[in-house]
Swiss-Prot record:
Protein name: Adenosine kinase
Regulation: The enzyme is subject to substrate inhibition by adenosine and is competitively inhibited by the adenosine analog iodotubercidin. Unlike other adenosine kinases it is not stimulated by inorganic phosphate. Activity is stimulated in the presence of potassium. Is inhibited by a series of 7-(het)aryl-7-deazaadenine ribonucleosides bearing small and bulky substituents in position 7; some of them display micromolar antimycobacterial activity and low cytotoxicity.
Role according to the record: Catalyzes the phosphorylation of adenosine to adenosine monophosphate (AMP). Can also catalyze the phosphorylation of the adenosine analog 2-methyladenosine (methyl-Ado) to methyl-AMP, the first step in the metabolism of this compound to an active form that displays antitubercular activity. Is not active on guanosine, inosine, deoxyadenosine, cytidine, uridine, or thymidine. Prefers dGTP and GTP to ATP as phosphate donors in vitro.
Gene3D superfamilies assigned to the protein according to its UniProt record, in alphabetical order: 3.40.1190.20
N-acetylthreonine: modified positions: 2
Keywords for the protein's UniProt record, in alphabetical order: Acetylation, ATP-binding, Kinase, Magnesium, Nucleotide-binding, Purine salvage, Transferase
Lineage, opening ranks: Bacteria, Bacillati, Actinomycetota, Actinomycetes, Mycobacteriales
One Gene Ontology MF term: dGTP binding
Gene Ontology CC: plasma membrane
Superkingdom of the source species: Bacteria
Amino acid sequence: MTIAVTGSIATDHLMRFPGRFSEQLLPEHLHKVSLSFLVDDLVMHRGGVAGNMAFAIGVLGGEVALVGAAGADFADYRDWLKARGVNCDHVLISETAHTARFTCTTDVDMAQIASFYPGAMSEARNIKLADVVSAIGKPELVIIGANDPEAMFLHTEECRKLGLAFAADPSQQLARLSGEEIRRLVNGAAYLFTNDYEWDLLLSKTGWSEADVMAQIDLRVTTLGPKGVDLVEPDGTTIHVGVVPETSQTDPTGVGDAFRAGFLTGRSAGLGLERSAQLGSLVAVLVLESTGTQEWQWDYEAAASRLAGAYGEHAAAEIVAVLA
C-alpha cells in the first residue's frame, strides 16, 4: 500500500564566498547595509521534507505518493522523483509562485547569510486528501510533515475525518507554532516523530506531560542524534536502537527525513519496530555521509554489510529480505 507524504517541497541554492562577511560590515553604516558578494560557486540541491522522504521511500522500493505544492519550475524535480518511483500526480502546481527556495551564502568562517522563500508552499492548504484517496485508494499512512501551517492543520483534520492513519512530524515548524496549534497536530497520530530537542519543546509549549502525549498516540519516535533513537509505546515499553557508524560526517541536513523514510518503509514492508529503526538508521547515515539530501546512493550488498556490522547478521538478513 502507498505512503502519502505531505510537507514542503523546496530547492536549496548554496553559494560560497571566499572572504569574511565581517570584514565587509562597517559599524558606522550598519543602519543602511547594501552589499553584494562575488561568490565562487553555486550548488543546487533538491529538498524539502516531503521531497526528501518521498525520494528515500522510492529509492528503497516503497510505494509513495508526494502530496505538496510547487511552482512551474518543478518539472526537472518531478522527473528526478518519478525516476525513483515517486508518484507526483498529487503535487499542486501554483500558477503564480515558484517552488519554495532556500538561498544561503557561506563565508570562510562558516558564517552564513540566508533567506527562505516559501512560494508555492503557501498554497498547500488548497490540497484535499480526499482527492488523493479517490485517485489511489486509501493510503496505508499519511505523513504530516513540516509545511504551510494551515495545510498541516487541514491535512491532520482530514485524516481524522476520513479515518486515515497518520504520522505527526512537525519538526522545524514546532519553533513557530503555539502550544494550542501543536495540540491540533498530535491527537490520534499513529506515530509522533521528533528529535530530542523538539520533544522537549513540544512538552514545554503544550504544557503536556509525557503521559498526556502518550495517551493520544500509538508510538513516540524520538531521534537522539549520535545516540540513536528511542521508540516508546503508550505503556512505557521502550526500544532503543543505536546508530550505524559513519565513515564520515559531510552534512547533517536531511538526516531526520532519511530516518523517517527508512523506518516507515520498513514498517510498510512488514518489519517490526526494531528492524525498521535499524533500516532508518542506515538511510540516515547514508545521507549524513553525502552532500545534499538526495545525493546518496543505495547499494544492496553494501547495505547488507553495514547493517550486519552495526546490528548483526541476523538483523541484516531480516531487513534486506523485505527489500529484495
